[in-house]
Amino acid sequence: MLKVDSKLDYKVADISLADWGNKEMQLSEREMPGLMSIREKYGKEKPLKGLKVMGSLHMTIQTAMLIETLHALGADIRWASCNIFSTQDHAAAAIAANGTAKVFAWKGETLEEYWWCTEQALTWPDGSGPDLIVDDGGDATLLIHHGVKAEKDASILDEKTDNKEFQCVLDRLKLSVAETPGKWTAIAEKVRGVSEETTTGVHRLYQMQEAGELLFPAINVNDSVTKSKFDNLYGCRESLADGIKRATDVMIAGKVVVVVGYGDVGKGCAQSMRGFGARVLVTEIDPICALQAAMEGFEVCTMANAVERGDVFVTCTGNYHVITGEHISKMKDEAIICNIGHFDNEIEMGYLENSKTAKKIEIKPQVDKWVMESGKSVIVLAEGRLVNLGCATGHPSFVMSNSFTNQALAQIDLAKNEYEPKVMILSKKLDEEVARLHLERLGVELDVLSKEQADYISVDVEGPYKPDHYRY
């Protein structure tokens, strides 16, 4: 079991990649106008000065730009990735070499290494924890909350589980609680708040809030319009195809692509695949989303109906086992399976991994062919984890500037204000400001309401222009 070394400055794959990372970061500046504006606006004020910020978010070039922004605002930063395959090693090297943050991330971590990186990023040299957290998927938040529970009742660490990753969490905490009693309670007490990036992480936060277990304030960045309607939709519309094509070189045109789930992510994925000429099937459990898909011209059917027809399967739900072992056994020979929702449990990977008869053949990193007893095979991308980050480089810089500008504003908000432990969202005014910061880069000009027009629809000339309940 790896032990935390709070005096370690970084652990990355190859520090010599820093120059490459810095050049790509410079290339991203023009594509990330929101973050650059935040630096310009708040750089002198330094609202995060004296505050410790921990990040658990994909260590990509775009995230490096967010880290540089938080550093420019005065933060003392430690960082880990939130996915074992999503780190861009040159981005991690650049941040480590620049001294912008203490980074613990590399592509291809084991699960044990992943959770070590998370605890390592949560532990400052004096043994203290962060004031603020930037989370993606809720893993940093989960580790703290489960650590606090374990310090109250160590027996929970002896729970039996078939989930390999959760077993790593229990093992990590067992070592931590034994070596540093009271560590997690002390960390939780000092956290001013967390800003959460994803649908999955937000779902976890609301579950904890409803159970009365949320230990510190949380800002739901995911449900900012300039995040969910842009990152989730337009980001996935580009990065899904990037991941599939880099991994397999498959011709998408003419293929049957099954998109599992038609939320914002699923909408982007379905549009992407149709744009490449695929025949797209959508599966849904929500009648509203199903109706939306049908009205967009997609065939909507059950998984039972789609499973024998699909050439490519994409899970977009954030749910559990939406592709089961039974589904996998009925798929066409060499059907491609991938996930762009969040965790690897959207696909029942245990059906393949625990099988005594299925044989795994690695084609190349993050592309595995599983040959089943029947003689048929399936091709699984990124071991069922995020295909756009495991097999490509994630969303483009411009759309991530939307998301990360929200993250920076959320961190400033949590730094300046003290809140009750509950889940909040950023104001509509800030949401509109994030959008406004990105218009010039696209050559967009806005009309302006007259005073009479503003009065007529009961808004201010400067906005916000829509009520909170408006659905974009």
From Swiss-Prot:
NAD(+) binds at residues 198-200, 232, 261-266, 284, 319, 340-342, 388. Its EC number is 3.13.2.1. This is Adenosylhomocysteinase. GO terms for cellular component: cytosol. Keywords: Cytoplasm, Hydrolase, NAD, One-carbon metabolism. One of its GO terms (biological process) is one-carbon metabolic process. Pathway: Amino-acid biosynthesis; L-homocysteine biosynthesis; L-homocysteine from S-adenosyl-L-homocysteine: step 1/1. It catalyses: S-adenosyl-L-homocysteine + H2O = L-homocysteine + adenosine. SUPFAM superfamilies: Formate/glycerate dehydrogenase catalytic domain-like (SSF52283), NAD(P)-binding Rossmann-fold domains (SSF51735). Substrate binds at T60, D136, E197, K227, D231.
